[in-house]
């Protein structure tokens, strides 16, 4: 049975940082190293990002840029702690920001759906950038409020394709309550895990990632033959773990935050793997890649988008929505694909649409909307 997307809401933290200021912040945190500073500048300039939102108070950014200490934040560069804040300090910030930002996205989605919050039967939360319990799910139940008897599921630590896993979970759980609304919320606070040491493979993530949250209200199509309010209907999904790629992208808990490694081999792997796999998936639905009107591809970075455009013969402007979202908010991990779908809906993008995400594994997730 198909799954209707009734609405999508999104939210970003208040602290807005241009890519130029983000580079200055990185250079200040990392300290002097002439050759590496030049390399870092090229990385930040080549990301296709104009600005990002960070889950810290604005005074923290002002302090780093001006060399002051009004905020007394653990995120300020400290000689006695060269690796930056501890994981606990980063998780304290995650707990402060995660619930309220998820709440903003949820309120937006619920307002657009006209669904009574107390009628939500299933709640799915998605995040890979932090932990605390009682968590985001219970924050939403208290503050929206939702029914205290809503059934909860958490999709955790799956990386940038996590929202697609959340949508798949919503599809399955919606079958338990036909015709009743399901809420799926993804929220990430990647900037809390900025790396403070000169390790190039880990510093690329500092240049790419931002923070944000998005929410979807969904409902199984049974009993609702009319088109959903967004016109977005999930027809199917697929998943693929690429062989011999385990170490190309990793996301692990460390003593000073979570650490990501990104191999420069990933774009070549995408070009090699994606065409055959996606063609097989679409064939199961009577489609070919040429039938797809738009591709909502998670913008892991400009080189990933280039690789997808080449692999699928989309041309240079084939992923304009993905590049626009990357420029406006950066790579915000799991919610990013929801931001892209929201943008497509606002400009009334014709169907079908395929959403794609990439994560540690290397894993590829796809969702087909018709």
Question: Where do the protein language model's features map onto the residues?
Answer:
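Residues that mark the start of a beta-strand
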Residues: 4, 119, 151, 179-181, ...
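Claisen-condensing/thiolase-fold acyl-transfer catalytic domains that form or cleave C-C bonds
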Residues: 93, 103, 110, 128-130, ...
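Short, well-ordered amphipathic alpha-helical segments that serve as non-catalytic structural scaffolds
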Residues: 45-49, 97-113, 169, 213, ...
